[in-house]
Amino acid sequence: MSDNRGLAVVTGGARGIGEAIVDELVAAGYRVAVVDVNAKALAKTAEREAFRAGLVIPVELSITDRTAVERELGALAASHGAIQALVNNAGMTLPATFLDQTDEDWNRIIAVNLTGTFIMAQVAARQMVEQRSGVIVNISSVSAHGVRTGPAAYAAAKAGVEGLSRLMAVQLGPFGVRVNTVVVGTTATPWLLSRKSDEELETMRSTTLTGSIGEPADIAKTVAFLCSPSAKHITGQMVSVSGGQWMP
């Protein structure tokens, strides 16, 4: 394990890609706060060896609740020091075409994917600006670029995350805070594999230049690199981890 790099926060960290990101950041030397709204999934975090070693901290939290975010991130800083890295991975979507998208679903998807990212980033960035260092990685999707079909709200939210990330990089750079975006393609999460047939998965493979579907570890290793000292001169960038589904 690398030298202690301080505290990292990963939203949506109890499952899928988020869980893989937590593993990579722990291996890199971070103590990681695992933020998730799913209490059942979060409870499994407390069963892990890293929890027993004091390297992961489960935090049940809705990222759309600013008051709760300010309270919990403040408590984490008081107990473990200011946040050194934030990964905004939490997200959700609902099945619908553009013509069928309801206002209710639009608002819910935008709230989690875009507003929640904004709230978490702003609260964490205030700590980072004070200490004049930090890194934020926001997770986007190839859906923002029209690569695959899906709800209009999800595509709009992820496009918003990318624009927000660029603005953050410009405004936070003078304070020593780096901001980058990882654009995720089709990834073999447990959620995806449980819902798609072999035929559907094969169709998804055919949309990549590599002829393969990504693994959560592919995303996690990229995020860990961007959070590392090796990436100290990288900010304001969008990194596509999609097998070539989308190329910047």
Locate the predicted segments by residue:
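Active-site helix of classical SDR
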Residues: 121, 157-160, 165
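Residue(s) in the substrate-gating loop at a strand-loop-helix junction
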Residues: 141
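Substrate-binding pocket helix/loop in short-chain dehydrogenase/reductase
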Residues: 97-98, 105-110, 192, 200-204
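C-terminal helical subdomain
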Residues: 181, 203-234, 241-243
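Active-site loop immediately N-terminal to the catalytic Tyr-X3-Lys motif
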Residues: 99, 146-152, 174-175, 211, ...
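Short C-terminal tail/terminal secondary-structure segment
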Residues: 2, 145-146, 224, 235-248
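Alpha-helical segment proximal to the catalytic Tyr-Lys
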Residues: 126, 170-174, 232
